[in-house]
Amino acid sequence: HPNHEQKYCEESKQYDDHMIKNYDYKDMVYLSDDEMREVTGSDTYYGGSYDEAEAHCHPLNYALGIAKATLSAGAKIYENSPATSYKVLDDHVRVNTKNGSIKADRIVLACNGYLENLEKSLTSKILPMNNYIVATKPLDDETVQKINPKDIAFADSRFVINYFRMSADKRLLFGGGENYSQELSKNIVPIVTRPLEKIYPFLN
């Protein structure tokens, strides 16, 4: 967790100490300014927290794994049939879709930020926010060693965070930049490359 301003470093140290003292979690390590710049390959960062037990998650494989486990448990998955409404009746719940309906004993609204108008009591409580990610072309070994020699997944201290890691085929996956709308941006490249180029100006 690299800090983009020096003032956040003390908070990182306190967080590491808290995890160690209160949870006996001894994998938290505080990295100095120089150490953080060495592992990120960027002089834009100061010190920060490093979780030595951290892991990377492949979102698509994770979703496919959940789907596989769901099917193995006996559930059915209806693709391309979004729920448009539901009604709780005496002995079941009726879920309506564009082309039909499903009878269920109970339902779980697990829609992340994409609930839309399915549950109107929550509509006004959801802030639409889109965050974007780009991937570079495959990088040579020298560049990989320069920008991420320990193969760490980073998320920095900015309010609109920048997060980045290497892919299996040596691309830099970089997320950053947001818009607050139901509509996706038509051109995400400049939104994401601006913060990327500030951190890694040589990756142009």
Protein language model features and the residues they cover:
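Rossmann-like flavin
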Residues: 1-69
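A conserved short coil-to-beta-strand element within the FAD-binding core of flavoproteins
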Residues: 30-42, 75-93
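Active-site substrate-recognition segment that forms the wall
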Residues: 83-95, 100-141, 145-204
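General structural feature for long, well-ordered alpha-helical segments within catalytic domains
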Residues: 8-11, 15, 32, 62, ...
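Surface-exposed helix-capping loop/turn segments at secondary-structure junctions
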Residues: 23-26, 72-76, 200-204
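A generic structural signal for well-ordered alpha-helical segments enriched in polar/charged residues
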Residues: 21, 68, 72, 194-198
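Short, contiguous, pocket-lining structural segments
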Residues: 51-62, 78, 99, 184, ...
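Phosphate-binding active sites in nucleotide-utilizing proteins
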Residues: 54, 67, 71-77, 88, ...
